[in-house]
Amino acid sequence: MKISLSTSLFSIEQKVEYFNLNYQSLSDFSVVAKLNYTFTWYGNDFSIGFAPKKGEKLYFDLFFTFKASPNHPFAAENFKPDSEAIDFYVSFSWRLEGKDEVSKKLFELSVFGRARAFQIDDYKINLFSYLVYVIR
């Protein structure tokens, strides 16, 4: 699956390299994916003192994992009708990597380099609003 986005400064093409969903129950599931991104740079300016050349392509991989939290299994007590909540706890992480020298240098010189990886455990999602959306 490919998705494209374009602005006056750059265009982005996203491709799903792999997507693996393993589902046994709401307390035992995981999603693992790898996405490829190609940025084509059209701008003439970049605020960090390093600019890709006009028309240059930058290549990145995004690794993503999403799974049920082992610390908070999904159970009847997750349903809270008084507060219109269905608490669902997940853990997720992602990591962004440059695939070529220009993309790697961009990470080194910019704020993007500090935000290349992220992980959070036991994040609570309220499924109630999603349920209402599906019903409507």
From Swiss-Prot:
Protein family: Belongs to the MG439/MG440 family.
Organism: Mycoplasma pneumoniae (strain ATCC 29342 / M129 / Subtype 1)
Protein name (record): Uncharacterized protein MPN_649
Pfam families recorded: Lipoprotein_3
Domain of life: Bacteria
